[in-house]
Amino acid sequence: MVKASIVAALSFWLVGCSENRSSQCVKLIGVANQAVNSIEAVTAPSSADSIEALRKIAVVAEDTNKAMRDLSLTDGKLIEFRDRFTAMYEATSAATQSLIQSSSIKDTAASQKAYEDLKASTSQESPLVDEVNQYCNAGQ
């Protein structure tokens, strides 16, 4: 899973990156890992598709978005990655909120669109994590 990729990468770049870049990578990856852990905790139970689970996912996305925005980064590439993460979390939160709303009023078409939007936003995670890992491991 994505978490494993991020965690595995952590040990490699601690040695090879400059201290500044390395510490900023640790911050960015730490926030991303926390999001993965929180989402896994919500989706692990059998009720992962419940409205309550969707609400929790939306909160995790919003909280992670704020934590990402609050990161103090100076490395230009890491700032770009952070901005992409925040856009992804914003889209995930919005799609999840739409899915909750459309499900509560039993609007099948709107629910399907929200679901597609949610899939589109979350599909960005794996390639983005790969790019972050590659960048943070560069120079090994």
Identify what each model region corresponds to:
Residues W13-G16:
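C-terminal motif of bacterial Sec signal peptides marking the signal peptidase cleavage site
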Residues Q24-G139:
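Alpha-helical segments in soluble extracytoplasmic regions
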